[in-house]
A protein has these predicted regions:
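Iron-sulfur (Fe-S) cluster-binding modules
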Residues: 1-72, 100-104, 122-124, 130-137, ...
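Internal helical hairpin/lid segments
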Residues: 74-76, 82
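A mid-sequence interfacial segment
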Residues: 111-115, 127-130
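Gly/Ser/Thr-rich loops at beta-strand to alpha-helix junctions
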Residues: 48-50, 84-88, 113-115, 143-145
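Metallocofactor- and cofactor-centric catalytic cores in central/energy metabolism, strongly enriched
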Residues: 2, 63, 81, 85-90, ...
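Structural motif
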Residues: 77-78, 105
Length: 154
């Protein structure tokens, strides 16, 4: 993301009333992009229900800087791996990770994404870190919303 170079702020007082501040749109957009996470959800299994619950109004994670999901990896910087990853899905996940712009982070959501879970057989991958580097692990089956928010705040 770009650095915030210059901010031009002017206080305008229409008719002598209370003032309000205006700023350049580009500067405000650069600041928002610098301090917001744009996520790409890779949802494959039952943890997807808890992911939807965390992104709902009760545990609104947009208040912590994680904005609406982007469904293009080129526009996102946080990859949420939610659920079990099979051997057939592994190349797709790797390609999505490679398409993401720098800087990029990966969050493994749940036990299956972290270490394979109880699906320990030849068709599943025993953890996201066997395919791509993983930065944050949120344990649980499914993880509690509070644990997800704690992982997001790291």
């Amino acid at each position: 993301m770009g650095e915030l170079k210059e901010t031009t702020t002017a206080v305008m007082e229409p008719g002598g009333g209370a003032g309000f501040a205006t700023t350049k749109f580009e500067a405000a957009l650069a600041w928002a992009q610098k301090y917001s996470l744009f996520m790409y959800p890779f949802v494959t299994a039952c943890c997807g229900m808890e992911f939807m619950g965390v992104s709902g109004p009760r545990y609104d994670f947009a208040r912590f800087g994680s904005e609406a999901p982007r469904f293009s990896p080129r526009q996102s910087d946080l990859l949420w791996v939610v659920g079990t990853i099979t051997q057939r899905q592994a190349p797709i996940l790797k390609r999505i990770y490679e398409q993401m712009a720098e800087p990029k982070w990966v969050l493994a959501f749940g036990t299956c994404a972290s270490c394979g879970g109880f699906y320990d057989n030849y068709t599943t991958v025993a953890g996201t870190d066997k395919i791509i580097p993983c930065d944050i692990y949120v344990p649980g089956c499914p993880p509690r919303p509070e644990a997800v928010l704690d992982g997001l705040m790291l």
